[in-house]
């Protein structure tokens, strides 16, 4: 999982990316291609 300051650019890298908020953190999750996962930090 990548940790990035801004997820806006990462969101558009794959069409299945989803932006999810969990426990105050923002994640990008992708079930079809998990290597696109990221967390804002």
Curated annotation (Swiss-Prot):
One of its GO terms (biological process) is translation. The keyword Ribonucleoprotein applies. InterPro entries: Ribosomal_bL36 (IPR000473), Ribosomal_bL36_sp (IPR035977), Ribosomal_L36_bact (IPR047621). One of its GO terms (molecular function) is structural constituent of ribosome. Signal peptide: none annotated. Keywords: Ribonucleoprotein, Ribosomal protein. One of its GO terms (cellular component) is ribonucleoprotein complex. The keyword Ribonucleoprotein applies. PANTHER family: 50S RIBOSOMAL PROTEIN L36 2, LARGE RIBOSOMAL SUBUNIT PROTEIN BL36B. Belongs to the bacterial ribosomal protein bL36 family. This is Large ribosomal subunit protein bL36. It comes from Bartonella bacilliformis (strain ATCC 35685 / KC583 / Herrer 020/F12,63).
